[in-house]
Structures are given as C-alpha cells and as structure tokens.
Regions:
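Generic hydrophobic, amphipathic alpha-helix propensity
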Residues: 4-15, 29, 54-58, 62
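Helix-turn-helix
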Residues: 7, 15-49
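Solvent-exposed, amphipathic alpha-helical segments
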Residues: 11-18, 65-68, 143-150
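Hydrophobic alpha-helical connector segments
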Residues: 53, 60-99
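Short alpha-helical scaffolding segments that buttress acidic/His motifs in well-ordered protein cores
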Residues: 86-90, 99-106, 140-147
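Conserved, surface-exposed functional patches that form binding/active-site neighborhoods
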Residues: 91-98, 106-109, 113-117
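Hydrophobic/aromatic-rich alpha-helical bundle segments in the mid-to-C-terminal region
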Residues: 111-117, 121-189
Length: 189
C-alpha cells in the first residue's frame, strides 16, 4: 500500500521529468498528486525536502534491491554478482521515471545528489573488485552509466532486446575475467 509521502514523491518524479526542477512548486506537486497544498506541506516542508525525498527513495531502493539480488547470486556461486545485479536493476528501471528524475536533479540541483554519487562510487568499487582486469572493470562501469544516461535523456536507439544482448555479452566477458574465475584457473594449474 502506497503511503501519502510515496504518492507525493511519485508526483514529484513525474513533474521533474516533464518540467525539470526549476518549475517545480508545491502547488504543482499538489495538483499532480491530486491533493491540497497543505497535504503536501504536512509531509514535506519545502521544495528541497521534496527533491531530497525523491533522491533518498531511489538510492535506498536501488541499494537494497542490488545488494539483495547480489547476495542471492553470491549464494548461488554466480561470478560478478554485483555487476549482474546492477544490470538486472537497470532492466527493471528502464521503463521507470526515477532515472530521468535523478538525471534532471543532477543537472539542475547538483548539491542534492551526494547520496546518489556515494552509492555510485560504492557500486563502482564493488564491481571493480569482482573483475580481475581493471580496464574491463572500468568498461563495465561506463557501460552501466551509459545505459542509464541514454535512458534518462531518451536518446537510446537500441531496442530492449539489443540492450539485453549487450548486457549478456558484457556479463559473459566479465565472468571469464572475474576474480573468482581467475582464482579457480590458478588453482587448477
């Protein structure tokens, strides 16, 4: 069951995707959410709190889902679990407004995205630690970032199927170069 605060944040995401943050007002959020201005202000006292609420919600959800999936993949003995989880979360988010909202916020309100930057750095380190080749690890990070940015900017010209093929190929190459695979190969020699 969606809470009132979540309903308001959904409205903020939609508005930020359409109008950006500069035209975002409490009145506009209230209208988009179908509630009174007082109802919005009861949950969020300012535009800044609304924007931070969107960022925190996305960061929390992505972090929790990525680590939960990574833990499950680790239990299954799958190579590069954080990388695989990151691509899976991308697939789940590619039709949602959250990445577009985050991109708009980063462009217009860069001081608000520190939590997102921290999460990105955290995932980057985790992915890099899974892959034995540092250049390949960096390539994987750039591919993930590029997929999100292209989606957020609506400039993706590849179909979902083509992107899935790209992701499968990256995961295949990464798995062959995972620290787990390298350790197993060395143990076999």
């Amino acid at each position: 069951v969606e809470t009132t605060a979540e309903h308001i944040l959904d409205a903020v995401e939609r508005l930020v995707c359409i109008e950006g943050t500069r035209k975002l007002t409490i009145d506009a959020v209230a209208a988009e959410a179908g509630m009174s201005k007082g109802g919005v202000l009861y949950n969020f006292r300012s535009k800044q709190e609304l924007l931070l609420g969107v960022i925190r919600r996305v960061v929390t959800e992505v972090r929790e889902r990525t680590y939960a999936l990574s833990d499950k993949l680790t239990e299954q003995g799958v190579a590069c679990p954080i990388l695989r989880a990151s691509f899976q979360i991308y697939k789940e988010y590619r039709e949602k407004t959250a990445p577009k909202a985050l991109f708009a916020l980063a462009a217009q309100e860069p001081e608000l995205v520190a939590e997102f930057q921290d999460m990105s750095t955290e995932f980057g380190r985790a992915i890099s630690s899974e892959i034995s080749d540092p250049v390949l690890g960096h390539m994987c990070l750039l591919i993930i970032d590029g997929l999100y940015y292209r989606q957020a900017l609506d400039i993706e010209h590849c179909s979902a199927g083509e992107i899935d093929e790209l992701i499968d190929r990256v995961l295949e190459i990464s798995s062959q170069n995972s620290r787990h695979a390298v350790l197993n190969a060395e143990a076999g020699n």
